[in-house]
């Protein structure tokens, strides 16, 4: 399988970019990964890169976007930070990947059994990590369905907080970046959230987070703190 070129990138729609990732994840789960000559891809991309998607994911060693979506060199721009939080540096990276490098899709990808989410659930204090976990705390607060054992030992609670964090990050992208919001509104890029299972290898896209053009299925409706303030 060849890496994307300037010509092939120009034909990719946001919807097709999402389909590429769905198909790649199914290959990964079924252990039917596409054959790639990686050295040939190194040669093909030495003059430039033409990615079709950008993935914001956690630093967890099990969640490499290129692997779980079965993509090659030059296909995906990968942004990684614990808890898939959004800040100005993350947004700047996304703006470069979409406006400059031509990416057609932005995915915010959380994952099950996330250490950062668990740390936030347990109110862990540890050096600079505490500052990062504090940015996830609103997602813990916004989870209202679990009344007992609101700690990392409750898998259902952790899963709910994980999904809320993904949704907050998706919303923060369009709330805090004029560049990306306008590209979404013009249908130039798509934006969607998803959760990766470290047990099965499957990515579940949160369909109601999909934004592209006039299609926007959800608005974050969480009391008290808006997405922009909560993810700063």
Predicted region positions:
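Short beta-strand segments
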Residues: 56-58, 80, 107-111, 192-197
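Divalent-metal-activated hydrolytic enzyme cores
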Residues: 1-48, 73-74, 83-104, 115-232
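Gly/Ser/Thr-rich loops at beta-strand to alpha-helix junctions
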Residues: 60-62, 111-116
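Conserved H-X4-D acyltransferase segment
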Residues: 50-59, 63-65
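Catalytic core of membrane glycerolipid acyltransferases/transacylases, capturing the structured
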Residues: 62-79, 85
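Short active-site oxyanion
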Residues: 52-54, 103-106
